[in-house]
Curated annotation (Swiss-Prot):
Organism, scientific name: Clostridium novyi (strain NT)
Similarity annotation: Belongs to the universal ribosomal protein uS19 family.
Protein name as catalogued: Small ribosomal subunit protein uS19
PANTHER family: RIBOSOMAL PROTEIN S19P FAMILY MEMBER, SMALL RIBOSOMAL SUBUNIT PROTEIN US19M
Assigned keywords, A-Z: Ribonucleoprotein, Ribosomal protein, RNA-binding, rRNA-binding
Encoding gene per record: rpsS
Biological function: Protein S19 forms a complex with S13 that binds strongly to the 16S ribosomal RNA.
């Protein structure tokens, strides 16, 4: 289900505040955030935001195609290491 139009999109206040301050100063530093559920706004274009994946912060450069999506969509939280292969004898090889 999508969010109600009367509520508007969610963006963490601390994140939007940092973006606005950097836009006023003309800076382009990496911003760390744990807010994966924040919606990407047009004001964020050109910035690099380090989004937490549960273990580390992964830098994400914001482009035009990302506007309207959530930050968490661009940072995976799980790593797939592949299925285990079997040898001729039936023992597993990693």
């Amino acid at each position: 289900m999508s969010r109600s139009l009367k509520k508007g999109p969610f963006v963490a206040e601390s994140l939007i505040k940092k973006i606005e301050e950097m836009n006023e100063k003309g800076e382009k530093k990496v911003i760390k955030t744990w807010s994966r559920s924040s919606t990407i706004f047009p004001q964020m274009l050109g910035h690099t935001i380090a989004v937490h994946d549960g273990r580390k912060h992964v830098p994400v450069y914001i482009s035009e195609d990302m506007v309207g999506h959530k930050l968490g969509e661009f940072v995976l939280t799980r790593t797939f290491k592949g299925h285990v292969d079997k040898t001729e004898k039936g023992t597993r090889v990693k």
